């Protein structure tokens, strides 16, 4: 390592009695080396077994919405068919997942739109989904009405945080009607929204498949809207220039084959 530091004419580690710590230059080098090593490992695993499916691993980044309404069933079927494959699942927002695809940390991402994807990354639409407005049981009376987005603004709102693509998406929907999205409660993850709705903290937009079980149990109520909320998509994002192992290719192809 000393030789490498001399060749690069820079310090990569700060050495102390407690161990070593990467310098900013070392962090940058580590990021590039990590991506190369993961690609090398994927190639090594593929070559070690011509079938590629008796062992190996697949690294996937998934948003919670994509995981809950699309990916879980695909992972279950894949694991039953190929139990020797190790699955590495990362909980990412859409931007985080796309960045991980770019850096080579994951084989591909399954996320919800909108997704900003630039070449050489490619995007495959897998499944459309509709989001609905829901509230807790104290809002039951609204279930027999039909609200405009302007009227929705009169009630407390729950949404994901402002740094998420979902927030930006709904902010653009409200702006298209001359309104500003100003939620009273911001959740860190999509899975937090439904419990917050049940606790009567406000109204929220949820994917219909995620809301359906609670609607059937009458734990929440759907509130009809006068204004149309555009359909969104679950999509798969991958790097067309990044080599995938056989297992990752198989899971990717299985996911694409199962698109709606």
What is the predicted role of each segment?
Residues 7-8, 29-51:
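Alpha-helical linker/hinge and terminal dimerization helices associated
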Residues 59-61, 131, 147-167, 259:
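Short loop->beta-strand "edge-of-pocket" segments that line small-molecule binding or catalytic clefts
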Residues 5-22:
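A short LG(V/I)-centered, amphipathic sequence patch enriched
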Residues 141-142, 156-177, 244-248, 252:
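Secondary-structure junction motif
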